A protein has these predicted regions:
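Positively charged n-region of N-terminal signal peptides that target proteins for export
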Residues: 1-5
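Residue-level detector of conserved, function-critical positions
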Residues: 22-584
């Protein structure tokens, strides 16, 4: 099978992605290789990107960065990156040049814009339509957020809008825009500007929060007291507190009283919970905030009453009815590390709440990781050996951190392991599969669990109630997509559906991922395609030594060492002619 097949590991946690029926269909494009160089063809087999590049793909970022890159924004997969002579550029799927082959490194696409760094080490921005946002070159930039990017020239910061308008870099520090306003520092004091650079709030404060949230911005006056202003600069909540949370969440913020205890206020400054907590550990989420009391950690309501105690080292906000919790040990060791890159200052709960190893934070440092100065430092770093768990809004344990490992919660449940065995619980905490399996691969899209028992045999379980769909008698089982599964018996592969029905006997040398309802299988006479019912989709006179899954009605096939394209009837759209092929 074509080399882009992913290999599954026993402990892997798979989250299936679904393409919405409302999403526009992208033009078919395949990368092709000829005489050692890459280009691209369309669905008719016509060359749309010249075959003259060293590399070509949807993303040429490092492998561990490609997922974030390709999911950075809607429409990202309509762009193809090419490289020649160490420089890169972008094309559309139809072959239109978006960014010329000119940059050495880049950011990810955000809000239809991309930051690129050229050979001169200066940074500029392009739009997806290929236009240059500004001809000014910057030393450091952020991604665009809410229509504005922070830019640095020399030692000062400014802003650039998507339409190329610049707020001149005159500020000592700058923070992101939110609702058309941003906090900036000039002459040692903080104020608030609009998107034209006009001051809405004069620079009179010693510090501010990261950005407006729910119409409020935290500010610190010359007496080192904190309060909040509204969008007009009015001190709705006059500075009177030693510390406050950086932003409101669900209409509430945390405040530190004279007693060195924390309480809650609403957006008008009314105290809803008098100072009583040793720390506030999370912003409000789904009506609850993680807090530290004299009796331990728990979750509190806006009025300060404790919903339930949660005796864990770390608490996290709720999401879809579940909150992550963690327990862990702390140790300090020396490591060699790169210094962080940030424009302005970081801002997070840890500055106030003295919960030093809490990973939850409202981070506002900015800058592209590609702009590292290349300097290493030896420094002591605190390492936390953590174990994750999940609880619901009553405090019920859904997945205990006492397990050796609890994986990130999925839409239907949670994978966990203990003593070298794997299990699965649903989001109510019911064990669907107890921790008795030596391997477990959740397939949430098809609602099944691929499980391996202590005899090294694989079976298929229902994700709904754990009942056995396929018996534990197979050397291997693979999820093939489209509700189909491959099972291996006596060295050959057969096909089954998600109900456990065997659609074919074990006849095939290999199987691969289904594409558009057609399943590639390998016989002694090469690769063929099956229908969902397990029948041959079409006969073909040629022997396919390799194939790709179908995409947009076409599949790649390799015949006598060359790649071509066929449609779903087996007809050649592009006869085999290329050294390599990759459907994008």
């Amino acid at each position: 099978m074509k080399k882009r097949t992913l290999l599954l590991t026993l402990a892997a946690f798979w989250t299936a992605t679904t393409i919405s029926a409302n999403e526009p269909t992208l033009p078919f494009t395949a990368a092709v290789k000829e005489n050692g160089m890459w280009g691209a063809v369309n669905g008719a087999g016509q060359v749309v990107i010249p075959i003259s590049y060293d590399r070509l793909g949807l993303s040429l970022s490092e492998a561990d960065e490609q997922k974030e890159d390709l999911l950075s924004e809607e429409g990202r997969d309509d762009l193809i990156e090419a490289e020649k002579g160490g420089l890169r550029g972008f094309f559309t799927r139809t072959g239109k040049e978006v960014i010329p082959i000119s940059y050495e490194s880049r950011s990810i696409w955000k809000e239809g814009a991309l930051a690129v760094r050229g050979k001169d080490k200066k940074i500029s921005f392009y739009k997806k339509d290929g236009s240059l946002i500004s001809r000014a070159a910057y030393d450091q930039v952020s991604d665009f957020e809410n229509g504005m990017a922070i830019v640095k020239q020399g030692a000062t910061y400014g802003y650039l809008s998507l339409d190329g308008k610049e707020v001149k870099p005159v500020y000592q520090e700058a923070r992101f825009f939110e609702d058309g306003l941003a906090a900036v520092k000039e002459k040692g004091r903080w104020g608030v500007i609009d998107m034209t650079g006009r001051y809405i709030v004069s620079p009179i404060y010693k510090d501010t929060g990261a950005a407006f949230q729910e119409g409020r911005l935290a500010v610190k006056n010359q007496k080192n007291l904190w309060g909040y202003i509204d969008r007009e600069g009015k001190e709705i909540i006059p500075p009177a507190y030693k510390a406050v949370s950086p932003a409101f969440s669900e209409g509430y913020a945390a405040i530190l009283g004279d007693s060195k205890l924390w309480g809650f206020i609403d957006t008008e400054g009314n105290v809803t919970a008098k100072p009583q907590f040793k720390a506030v550990l999370t912003p409000f989420s789904e009506g609850l905030s993680g807090v530290k009391t004299i009796d331990g950690n728990g979750y509190a309501r806006p009025d300060g009453t404790i919903a339930f105690m949660a005796d864990y080292d770390q608490l996290f906000p709720f999401k879809d009815g579940l909150a992550e919790v963690r327990e862990g040990e702390v140790e300090t060791r020396a490591v060699r590390s790169l210094p962080p890159i940030s424009i302005g200052i970081g801002w997070g709960w840890g500055d106030w709440l003295a919960f030093r190893h809490h990973p939850w934070g409202w981070g506002w440092g900015i800058g592209l990781p590609i702009w590292y100065p290349g300097r290493y430092d030896d420094e002591p770093v605190t390492s936390v050996t953590e174990k994750r768990g999940y609880i619901d809004k009553t405090g019920k344990v859904i997945a205990s951190p006492a397990n050796d490992r609890v994986f990130s919660a999925g839409r239907k449940g949670i994978l966990l392991s203990k003593d070298g065995r794997y299990g699965w619980v649903d989001r109510e905490g019911t064990y669907i599969a107890h921790t008795i399996y030596t391997g477990l691969l959740p397939d949430e899209e098809d609602g099944v669990l691929l499980a391996k028992d202590e005899n090294k045999k694989w079976g298929l379980l229902s994700m709904e109630d754990g009942h056995e769909l396929l018996p534990f008698s197979y050397k291997e089982i693979r999820s093939l997509g489209s509700g189909l599964f491959g099972y291996k018996e006596e060295g050959k592969w057969g096909i089954a559906d998600k109900e456990g029905t065997r659609l074919t006997a074990p006849l095939y040398l290999a199987v691969s991922k289904a594409g558009e309802g057609l399943l590639p299988v390998k016989t002694k006479n090469g690769w063929r395609f099956l229908t969902p019912a397990g029948h041959e989709a079409f006969p073909h006179d040629d022997t396919f030594s390799d194939v790709t899954p179908f995409s947009s009605g076409l599949a790649g096939v390799k015949v006598k060492g060359k790649w071509g394209l066929i449609d779903q009837t087996g007809r050649y759209v592009m006869r085999p002619a290329y050294e390599d092929l990759d459907i994008l």
